[in-house]
Curated annotation (Swiss-Prot):
UniProt topology in membrane: Multi-pass membrane protein
Protein name as catalogued: Cytochrome b
UniProt source species: Bradypus tridactylus (Pale-throated three-toed sloth)
Keyword entries, A-Z: Electron transport, Heme, Iron, Membrane, Metal-binding, Mitochondrion, Mitochondrion inner membrane, Respiratory chain, Transmembrane, Transmembrane helix, Transport, Ubiquinone
Primary localisation category: mitochondrion
Length: 379
């Protein structure tokens, strides 16, 4: 008798995607991050749904509604901090996932890679809008600074900013539309995730060697599901430890002060996961130049497949490119650190040098290293 999961119209696609999926036998723990990101997304949707039941998207009551959630709602403080720290875990997994794809050359699956970049941009936009909702000092001023960047666009910039604000400054209309968009965005992300998986399952997964694995594949369940559960437990324990022991570790103390348009914080900064892009933005002297470099810092991922010059796909046997990959990783950590510092020497100089190194490594040094390695291999 045929198993129902292989014949039922609803269960058959799930079976092909999660149970009987032919998977390379040699993929490492770095391939766990996709399932971790899926778990993070589900957790964010569920906690966000419960928060939305009690949140008020009005400038006069938004801050107090967050206080009400934490004080009066059963386990409201847990849900709120799970949502905030869950976002941090989401970005941690997201950046590790991108790093793994860069290291092992998975960007050569163009459709999967490009939908992944679209996902990254959508998740970043969603997180930014979510950061505005508590209506604390950093929420208000962060939103003011970032949305104001659009005014650098020639001709239409000022009109565009006022259209996004729904007025001449950030006010009730802005908060309402940010809440609406923040609520709907995870479902758009969910649709993009399905597209991402659809393209991935068209080609099959890459592997650490970067070679075809058609001759050696195993079913996803039980082998890789067991491996994924270990990563899942580690992530859940880390998130719970962060939420229950140090809930405000990754937040900003200024957000415990209600938004005040008349009092500017001494140092405006976004959440830690945007700091690298924020450093690149403020290291550029002109406003329009800063906006362009900010956009390019993310969209540079789209052109990485075009800059691949090596004959080998993965970095596993390419020592020069490996060194450059870890230099890029260290550079991103430096950019993140500088983003949290005030705009004073020597931080401005370090930020400028790190920003230049970021683009140079991706666009010039890595393609050059690929050509050198081809010559060393006599290819």
């Amino acid at each position: 008798m045929t198993n129902i999961r292989k014949t039922h119209p609803l269960l058959k696609p799930i079976n092909h995607a999660l149970i009987d999926l032919p998977t390379p036998s040699n993929i490492s723990t770095w391939w766990n991050l996709g399932s971790l990101l899926g778990t993070c997304l589900i957790m964010q949707i569920l906690t966000g749904l419960f928060l939305a039941m009690h949140y008020s998207s009005d400038t006069t009551t938004a801050f107090s509604s967050i206080a009400h959630i934490c004080r009066d709602v059963n386990y409201g403080w847990t849900i709120r901090h799970l949502h905030a720290n869950g976002a941090s875990m989401f970005f941690m997994c997201l950046y590790l996932h991108i790093g793994r794809n860069l290291y092992y050359g998975s960007y050569s699956y163009l459709e999967t890679w490009n939908t992944g970049v679209m996902l990254l941009l959508t998740v970043m936009a969603t997180a930014f809008m979510g950061y505005v909702l508590p209506w604390g000092q950093m929420s208000f001023w962060g939103a003011t600074v970032i949305t104001n960047l659009l005014s650098a666009i020639p001709y239409i910039g000022t009109d565009l900013v006022e259209w996004i604000w729904g007025g001449f400054s950030i006010e009730k209309a802005t908060l309402t539309r940010f809440f609406t968009l923040h609520f709907i965005a995870p479902f758009i992300i969910l649709a993009l995730v399905l597209t991402h998986l659809l393209f991935l399952h068209e080609t099959g997964s890459n592997n650490p060697l970067g070679i075809s694995s058609n001759s050696d594949k195993i079913p996803f369940h039980p082998y890789h599901t067991i491996k994924d559960i270990l990563g899942l437990l580690i992530m859940i324990l880390t998130t719970l430890a962060l939420t229950l022991l140090h809930p405000d570790l990754l937040g900003d103390p200024n957000n415990y002060t209600p938004a005040n348009p008349l009092n500017t914080p001494p140092h405006i900064k976004p959440e830690w996961y945007f700091l690298f892009a924020y450093t690149i933005l403020r290291s550029t002297p002109s406003k329009l130049g800063g906006v362009l470099t900010l956009i390019c810092s993310i969209l540079v991922l789209v052109i990485i497949p075009m800059t691949h010059t090596a004959k080998q796909r993965s970095l596993t046997f390419r020592p020069i490119s490996q060194c450059l990959f870890w230099i890029l990783t260290a550079d991103l950590l430096i950019l993140t650190w500088i983003g949290g510092q005030p705009m004073d020497p020597p931080f401005t100089t370090i930020g400028l040098l790190a920003s230049i190194l970021y683009f140079t490594t991706i666009l010039i040094l890595t393609p050059t290293a690929g050509l050198i390695e081809n010559n060393l291999m006599k290819w």
